[in-house]
């Protein structure tokens, strides 16, 4: 609540200042014909929308408890808010770019540059205040939320209740949510007797809320996972991603204010306009009065020329520079938030090296259906099928596998153990718990049917192979011929009296 309260106060303060100043800039830009100020006012409008989105995302992201409709809570709300803010900012950049191109074709003279200068300085002060409020969100901090689930256990939330350690070898531990001690350990809430996969007991009257008065049964393979104390003090990277979008909006607005101030100063000191009562010609754009300059000169009347012309092109040029800077700073935010929502493998995870280390674990015969994705921020989740030799040694193998995932920064893992059946070979049947044939197309990476002969008395199950595992097998083994890749179809001929031969697939 403390972090939410601080961010909420900053966002509300910046929202009020931004909205009031946006209205002021729109009025002044129309009166003075300043493109830079008009662009900055549009940017202010985008900032208002960004701050509203950030407030909503920040509020929803506090609801980290699991529900029957959302087993991960609203952790990804801030990632979605960051993506929306990045899209807003990108669209705003293109709108400013089109307006700048129009000003290159038809330049306009700025009216009342001192007024523009005053408003620009005031806007710069507001944006500097915003940068001071959100400067600690300009980068990312590392966060590690641990959660493990091996075998038949489900996922817990990244931040579960603190539980008290018991004697070694104890499997079931009852802990009241309010208990705390100096030797506390943090782990996920894993409850075996509930329908919620995240292990939270739900109130029958209100399924959306967990029951706070019940004791929580925690069972993690007989051992509690010890977490470092500094994990609770670190701020979640998902919130950093959302607030970074706000910071980029404020930074872009500050750049716009700087452009307004510079353009107003240059125009005030360099531009020589026409005074009232004097005949003046502006050579910077077509003027029908130019045709009469020679006639007027023959009468020895004084003719003045406005200029220099480059001052009129400074405004759109600086706007183009601002657009380039904003796009350069927004692209990483847009890319990162989109990749998180697309559930791609985090860039800091070397998936091939991870598979290699898992296969090198003693007691592991095969690794397949390995999937790694990023839930939000630094909360990385992994699932895998691990084939082991002996069920009795699985617990030791699971601890080693857990350490391998920890070393790669993956702290929320679900391992499906598979034990080799008698006479089976890992290279022939990589998955002992294959999916049914009718659900093959609904898996993450599809299925590959296993060829079998007609002599087999039992049906051979469909073999499920992940895309990465299939690519690794193709790299290690020589390519098969086209005929060998075709699944074998078995036709059984039954000799029935007075009946035609019957075939079955």
From Swiss-Prot:
Subcellular location: Cell membrane; Basolateral cell membrane; Cytoplasmic vesicle membrane; Cytoplasm
UniProt keyword list: Antiport, Cell membrane, Cytoplasm, Cytoplasmic vesicle, Endoplasmic reticulum, Glycoprotein, Golgi apparatus, Ion transport, Membrane, Metal-binding, Nucleus, Phosphoprotein, Repeat, Transmembrane, Transmembrane helix, Transport, Zinc, Zinc transport
Region described as Disordered: spans on this chain: 142-215
A GO MF label: calcium channel inhibitor activity
One of the record's GO cellular component terms: cytoplasmic vesicle membrane
Membrane topology reported for the UniProt record: Multi-pass membrane protein
This protein's record includes keyword Hydrolase: no
GO BP, one annotated term: detoxification of zinc ion
Role: Zinc ion:proton antiporter that could function at the plasma membrane mediating zinc efflux from cells against its electrochemical gradient protecting them from intracellular zinc accumulation and toxicity. Alternatively, could prevent the transport to the plasma membrane of CACNB2, the L-type calcium channels regulatory subunit, through a yet to be defined mechanism. By modulating the expression of these channels at the plasma membrane, could prevent calcium and zinc influx into cells. By the same mechanism, could also prevent L-type calcium channels-mediated heavy metal influx into cells.
Name of protein: Proton-coupled zinc antiporter SLC30A1
Source organism per UniProt: Macaca fascicularis (Crab-eating macaque)
Lineage: Eukaryota, Metazoa, Chordata, Craniata, Vertebrata
Gene encoding the protein: SLC30A1
């Amino acid at each position: 609540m403390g972090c939410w309260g601080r961010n909420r106060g900053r966002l509300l303060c910046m929202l009020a200042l931004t909205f009031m100043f946006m209205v002021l800039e729109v009025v002044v830009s129309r009166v003075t014909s300043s493109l830079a100020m008009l662009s900055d006012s549009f940017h202010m409008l985008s900032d208002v929308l960004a701050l509203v989105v950030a407030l909503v995302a920040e509020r929803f992201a506090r609801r980290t408890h699991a529900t029957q409709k959302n087993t991960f809570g609203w952790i990804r709300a801030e990632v979605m808010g960051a993506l929306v803010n990045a899209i807003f900012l990108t669209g705003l950049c293109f709108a400013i770019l089109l307006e700048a191109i129009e000003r290159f074709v038809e330049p306009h003279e700025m009216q009342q540059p001192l007024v523009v200068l005053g408003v620009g300085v005031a806007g710069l002060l507001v944006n500097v205040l915003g940068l001071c409020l959100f400067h600690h969100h300009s980068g990312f901090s590392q966060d590690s939320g641990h959660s493990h689930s091996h075998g038949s256990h489900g996922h817990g939330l990244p931040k579960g209740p603190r539980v008290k350690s018991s004697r070694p070898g104890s499997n079931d531990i009852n802990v009241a949510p309010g208990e705390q001690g100096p030797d506390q350990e943090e782990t996920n809430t894993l409850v075996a007797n509930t329908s919620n996969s995240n292990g939270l007991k739900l109130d029958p009257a209100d399924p959306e809320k967990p029951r706070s008065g019940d004791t929580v049964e925690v069972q993690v393979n007989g051992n509690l996972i010890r977490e470092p104390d500094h994990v609770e003090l670190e701020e979640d990277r998902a919130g950093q991603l959302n607030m970074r979008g706000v910071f980029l909006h404020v930074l872009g607005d500050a750049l716009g204010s700087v452009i307004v101030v510079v353009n107003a100063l240059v125009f005030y000191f360099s531009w020589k306009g026409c005074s009232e009562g004097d005949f003046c010609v502006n050579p910077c754009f077509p003027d029908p009065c130019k045709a009469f300059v020679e006639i007027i000169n023959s009468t020895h009347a004084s003719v003045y020329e406005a200029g220099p012309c480059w001052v009129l092109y400074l405004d759109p040029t600086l706007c183009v520079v601002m657009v380039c800077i904003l796009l350069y700073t927004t692209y990483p935010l847009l890319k990162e938030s989109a990749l998180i929502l697309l559930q791609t493998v985090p860039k800091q995870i070397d998936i091939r090296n991870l598979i290699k280390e898992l296969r090198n674990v003693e007691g592991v015969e095969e690794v397949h259906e390995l999937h790694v994705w990023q839930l939000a921020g630094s909360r990385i989740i992994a699932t895998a099928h691990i084939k082991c030799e002996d069920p009795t040694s699985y617990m030791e193998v699971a601890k080693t596998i857990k350490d391998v995932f920890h070393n790669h920064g993956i702290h929320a893992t679900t391992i499906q153990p598979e034990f080799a059946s008698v006479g089976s070979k890992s290279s022939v049947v990589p998955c002992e718990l294959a999916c049914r044939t009718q659900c093959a197309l609904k898996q993450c990476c599809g299925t590959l049917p296993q060829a079998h002969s007609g002599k087999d008395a039992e049906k051979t199950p469909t073999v499920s192979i992940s895309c990465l595992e299939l690519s690794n097998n193709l790299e290690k083994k020589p390519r098969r011929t086209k005929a060998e890749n075709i699944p074998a179809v078995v036709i059984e001929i039954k000799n029935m009296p007075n009946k035609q031969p019957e075939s079955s697939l």
